Amino acid sequence: MALLALLCSCHDEDKGDIPQSDERTADFIVKYKDDFGIHTDYKAKVYIYYGIYSMDIVGFHYLPDGVLDYGGKEITPDIRLSADGKEDITLLLDNAEKITVIVESSYYEGRVGITSYSPGDTPIKGIFTFGE
Protein backbone atom coordinates (compact mmCIF):
# COMPACT_ATOMS: atom_id res chain seq x y z
CA MET A 1 0.00 0.00 0.00
CA ALA A 2 2.83 2.41 0.80
CA LEU A 3 4.44 1.65 -2.57
CA LEU A 4 1.26 2.63 -4.38
CA ALA A 5 1.16 5.98 -2.57
CA LEU A 6 4.83 6.58 -3.34
CA LEU A 7 4.37 5.84 -7.04
CA CYS A 8 1.36 8.11 -7.29
CA SER A 9 3.13 10.99 -5.59
CA CYS A 10 6.22 10.59 -7.79
CA HIS A 11 4.05 10.62 -10.88
CA ASP A 12 2.41 13.88 -9.82
CA GLU A 13 5.80 15.48 -9.14
CA ASP A 14 7.09 14.48 -12.57
CA LYS A 15 4.00 15.88 -14.23
CA GLY A 16 4.68 19.30 -12.71
CA ASP A 17 8.13 19.41 -14.33
CA ILE A 18 6.70 19.37 -17.87
CA PRO A 19 6.54 22.94 -19.20
CA GLN A 20 3.24 24.03 -20.71
CA SER A 21 3.49 24.85 -24.40
CA ASP A 22 1.45 27.19 -26.55
CA GLU A 23 2.20 25.00 -29.57
CA ARG A 24 -0.08 22.29 -30.90
CA THR A 25 -0.20 20.29 -34.09
CA ALA A 26 -3.01 20.38 -36.60
CA ASP A 27 -3.65 17.89 -39.38
CA PHE A 28 -6.38 18.23 -41.99
CA ILE A 29 -7.42 15.78 -44.70
CA VAL A 30 -9.71 17.00 -47.46
CA LYS A 31 -11.57 14.64 -49.77
CA TYR A 32 -14.39 14.75 -52.26
CA LYS A 33 -16.96 12.16 -53.25
CA ASP A 34 -18.19 11.59 -56.78
CA ASP A 35 -19.79 8.74 -58.75
CA PHE A 36 -16.49 6.84 -58.73
CA GLY A 37 -15.73 6.96 -55.00
CA ILE A 38 -13.91 9.12 -52.49
CA HIS A 39 -10.72 10.91 -53.55
CA THR A 40 -8.15 13.23 -52.01
CA ASP A 41 -8.70 16.90 -52.89
CA TYR A 42 -5.09 17.72 -53.72
CA LYS A 43 -5.73 21.43 -54.33
CA ALA A 44 -7.98 22.18 -51.35
CA LYS A 45 -7.36 25.32 -49.33
CA VAL A 46 -7.40 25.65 -45.55
CA TYR A 47 -7.88 28.93 -43.70
CA ILE A 48 -7.29 29.28 -39.96
CA TYR A 49 -8.65 32.11 -37.82
CA TYR A 50 -7.30 32.59 -34.29
CA GLY A 51 -9.49 33.73 -31.42
CA ILE A 52 -12.93 33.03 -32.90
CA TYR A 53 -15.47 30.24 -32.96
CA SER A 54 -17.70 29.49 -35.95
CA MET A 55 -20.68 30.90 -34.03
CA ASP A 56 -18.87 34.27 -33.91
CA ILE A 57 -19.03 34.57 -37.69
CA VAL A 58 -22.65 33.60 -38.34
CA GLY A 59 -23.99 35.98 -40.98
CA PHE A 60 -20.59 36.71 -42.52
CA HIS A 61 -20.14 36.17 -46.26
CA TYR A 62 -17.29 34.00 -47.46
CA LEU A 63 -15.13 35.78 -50.06
CA PRO A 64 -12.11 34.61 -52.09
CA ASP A 65 -8.89 33.84 -50.20
CA GLY A 66 -10.75 33.06 -46.99
CA VAL A 67 -11.86 36.63 -46.29
CA LEU A 68 -15.06 36.90 -44.24
CA ASP A 69 -17.27 39.99 -44.66
CA TYR A 70 -20.21 41.32 -42.69
CA GLY A 71 -21.44 44.77 -43.69
CA GLY A 72 -17.98 46.02 -44.55
CA LYS A 73 -16.30 44.43 -41.53
CA GLU A 74 -13.70 42.00 -42.83
CA ILE A 75 -11.89 39.18 -41.08
CA THR A 76 -8.84 37.76 -42.82
CA PRO A 77 -7.37 34.37 -41.99
CA ASP A 78 -4.32 34.22 -39.75
CA ILE A 79 -3.00 31.27 -41.76
CA ARG A 80 -3.62 30.36 -45.41
CA LEU A 81 -2.63 26.88 -46.60
CA SER A 82 -3.00 24.78 -49.72
CA ALA A 83 -2.79 21.01 -50.04
CA ASP A 84 -0.30 21.48 -52.91
CA GLY A 85 -0.68 17.91 -54.11
CA LYS A 86 -0.40 16.35 -50.64
CA GLU A 87 -2.89 14.01 -49.05
CA ASP A 88 -2.95 15.93 -45.78
CA ILE A 89 -2.14 19.40 -44.55
CA THR A 90 -0.10 19.38 -41.34
CA LEU A 91 1.23 22.33 -39.39
CA LEU A 92 2.36 23.45 -35.97
CA LEU A 93 0.13 26.16 -34.53
CA ASP A 94 2.04 28.73 -32.50
CA ASN A 95 -0.65 29.28 -29.89
CA ALA A 96 -3.30 27.43 -27.95
CA GLU A 97 -6.29 29.75 -28.28
CA LYS A 98 -9.63 28.87 -29.85
CA ILE A 99 -9.57 28.63 -33.63
CA THR A 100 -11.95 28.31 -36.53
CA VAL A 101 -10.94 26.38 -39.64
CA ILE A 102 -12.55 26.88 -43.04
CA VAL A 103 -11.73 24.38 -45.77
CA GLU A 104 -12.46 25.15 -49.41
CA SER A 105 -12.90 22.34 -51.92
CA SER A 106 -11.10 22.70 -55.23
CA TYR A 107 -13.23 20.00 -56.84
CA TYR A 108 -16.64 21.40 -55.86
CA GLU A 109 -16.31 25.10 -56.54
CA GLY A 110 -17.83 27.32 -53.89
CA ARG A 111 -18.17 24.58 -51.28
CA VAL A 112 -16.64 25.14 -47.87
CA GLY A 113 -16.56 23.27 -44.59
CA ILE A 114 -16.20 25.00 -41.24
CA THR A 115 -15.39 23.81 -37.74
CA SER A 116 -13.94 25.22 -34.55
CA TYR A 117 -11.58 23.91 -31.90
CA SER A 118 -11.32 24.89 -28.24
CA PRO A 119 -8.03 25.86 -26.58
CA GLY A 120 -7.64 22.41 -24.98
CA ASP A 121 -8.10 20.49 -28.23
CA THR A 122 -4.72 19.00 -29.01
CA PRO A 123 -3.68 17.55 -31.32
CA ILE A 124 -6.18 18.87 -33.84
CA LYS A 125 -7.33 16.43 -36.52
CA GLY A 126 -9.97 17.22 -39.08
CA ILE A 127 -11.31 15.23 -42.02
CA PHE A 128 -13.53 17.07 -44.49
CA THR A 129 -15.38 15.19 -47.23
CA PHE A 130 -17.31 17.16 -49.83
CA GLY A 131 -20.11 15.40 -51.71
CA GLU A 132 -22.27 15.98 -54.74
Residue ranges and their predicted role:
Residues 1-12:
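Sec-dependent bacterial lipoprotein signal peptides
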Residues 29-31, 47, 102-104:
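Residue-level recognition of well-ordered beta-strand positions that form the cores
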Residues 59-83, 114-119:
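Solvent-exposed serine/threonine-rich low-complexity stretches and specific carbohydrate-binding patches
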Residues 94-132:
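Structured interaction patches on ligand/partner-binding surfaces of diverse proteins
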Residues 72, 79-100:
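Short Pro-Gly-centered beta-turn/loop motif in secreted/extracellular proteins
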Residues 35-72, 93-95:
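Short, ordered, surface-exposed loop/turn motifs in non-cytosolic proteins
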